[in-house]
Regions:
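Terminal alpha-helical segments
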Residues: 1-124
Length: 124
């Protein structure tokens, strides 16, 4: 998928996310992960780290070599998505206390991923 399509889908997911209430913890985390994945892929395409026909689905599904290769330009975007992915099982599939704070953190990481992607798009 090309960068422009990733931007379009991420923005669509974020429009839906904006309709969620603070207590909609599971949906906020899930949306942050989905939109964040699109922002990450857009950034990776725009900086030339990954071609448009190769997308990251989940950081934990990457080979060690791919994770390292994609982290070389800047390790933070992959780390941010990985953190959202780590939040997901505990608060979306589990019932750990502190869900609202976890959702806030996921959304904060999403904001940072979007900023990275928009900066990468501006530099292409």
């Amino acid at each position: 998928m090309n960068s422009a399509k990733h931007h379009e889908i991420a923005r669509n997911i974020e429009r839906s996310l904006a309709k969620c209430r603070p207590e909609d913890v599971e949906m906020r985390i899930e949306a942050a992960m989905l939109a964040g994945t699109h922002w990450l892929n857009a950034a990776l395409h725009d900086i030339g780290a990954n071609p448009p026909d190769k997308d990251v689905m989940h950081t934990y599904m990457l080979t060690i070599n791919d994770f390292r290769r994609l982290s070389l330009p800047d390790p933070q975007p992959l780390a941010m998505l990985a953190e959202i992915e780590d939040i997901r099982p505990v608060y979306v599939r589990g019932d750990a206390p502190g869900g609202r704070q976890a959702a806030d953190r996921a959304c904060s990481l999403l904001d940072r991923l979007r900023a990275v992607a928009l900066q990468a798009a501006a530099g292409r």
